């Protein structure tokens, strides 16, 4: 007797091989890489991610990382503000509310950095970078 322990999965594999050798079981097909497709997303998973309304929601607040949460929410609202400007124009009341919200929630250094460097210069040319999407 051997004192080495066998993994139960190895035992099953050895049994399968012996059955195949005796002709009692067909061999398993070889695995071809890249043939595994992701599982289909069910309705419950979709609703959990997007909410009942079907719109995507922000991730839950992580209390361990308050600065990260603040920065992420600041940037998301900043992007919503620019989407509002593209859709409704600069003078829309909803856009002004978002602008005020961005200015109140975001640190002044961050607002000036993303607003002036990435927003105003590239916005006049019709494009700007979007690193994080809602």
UniProtKB/Swiss-Prot annotation:
One of its GO terms (cellular component) is mitochondrion. Its main location: mitochondrion. Keywords: Disulfide bond, Mitochondrion. PROSITE patterns: CHCH (PS51808). A motif (Cx9C motif) lies at residues 74-84. Disulfide bonds join 74-106, 84-95. A motif (Cx10C motif) lies at residues 95-106. InterPro entries: COX6B-like, CX6/COA6-like_sf, Cyt_c_oxidase_su6B. The keyword Cytoplasm does not apply. Residues 1-61 are annotated as: Disordered. It comes from the Eukaryota. It is found in: Mitochondrion. Residues 7-19, 44-61 have a biased composition (Basic and acidic residues). This protein is one of the nuclear-coded polypeptide chains of cytochrome c oxidase, the terminal oxidase in mitochondrial electron transport. This protein may be one of the heme-binding subunits of the oxidase. PANTHER family: CYTOCHROME C OXIDASE SUBUNIT 6B, CYTOCHROME C OXIDASE SUBUNIT 6B-LIKE-RELATED. Belongs to the cytochrome c oxidase subunit 6B (TC 3.D.4.8) family. This is Putative cytochrome c oxidase subunit 6b-like. The lineage of its organism: Eukaryota, Viridiplantae, Streptophyta, Embryophyta, Tracheophyta.
């Amino acid at each position: 007797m051997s004192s080495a322990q066998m993994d139960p999965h190895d035992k099953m594999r050895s049994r399968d091989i012996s059955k195949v050798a005796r002709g009692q079981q067909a061999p398993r097909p070889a695995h071809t890489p890249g043939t595994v497709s992701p599982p289909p997303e069910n309705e419950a998973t979709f609703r959990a991610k997007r909410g009942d309304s079907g719109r995507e929601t922000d991730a839950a607040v992580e209390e361990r990382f308050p600065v990260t949460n603040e920065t992420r929410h600041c940037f998301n609202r900043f992007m919503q503000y620019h989407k509002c400007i593209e859709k409704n124009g600069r003078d829309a009341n909803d856009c002004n509310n978002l602008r005020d919200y961005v200015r109140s929630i975001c640190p002044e250094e961050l607002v000036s950095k993303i607003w002036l460097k990435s927003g105003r210069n590239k916005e006049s040319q019709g494009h700007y970078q979007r690193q994080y999407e809602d």
